[in-house]
Amino acid sequence: MAELRSFIFLSRLQPQTMCYLGTWIRGSLPRSHVAAQVIEVAPGLDIEPLTDVAVKHADVKAGILVVERQFGYLEIHGGTDEVQAAASAVLGALGATARDASRPEILASTIITKLDPQQAFLVNRNKIGSMALAGESLFVLEMRPASYAILAANEAEKAARIKLVDYRMIGATGRLYLSGSEADVRQAAEAAEDALRDLG
């Protein structure tokens, strides 16, 4: 029986969160403001039959289907009703409810103010999203399960005018990097952490 590690419904994918996905996903590219569902399970291969259920049950598109060392990931998107119908079908196949998903745990969270040019350079070497600039504030957040990084990114983007530098939602832990003015970064950080704590 698969372990449901996350079951994340996003009612409206925010533009930067969506565009970041577009830099690496191999499936159907979502558009901003569509609904999305992210599912993480263990063992990883159990995501394959769940994908079959989701895409056959409703008119949704799959953007992510990844099996990595331990965990499997699926992201589907489309209209709200279709995404929720597909997600419900997946829960039915698992014999689970959304409440059975693992709760997010914040492992690390910090804000670095007045980012040094050297650190900005190093952060930007490893990113896919926007660039962190010297003098900006940088927020970094790490959590597990990893897929909760997309929820944190989406909620941070809703809350403040920030730049999404990077988020990693696959693996042992998830990570989020965002930058901007100190006030905006603090507001976004609070929104990201609150979104995770609300599920805890």
Predicted regions and their residues:
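Short glycine-rich or small-residue beta-strand-to-loop segments that form or flank ligand, phosphate
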Residues: 33-42, 70-79, 136-142, 173-181
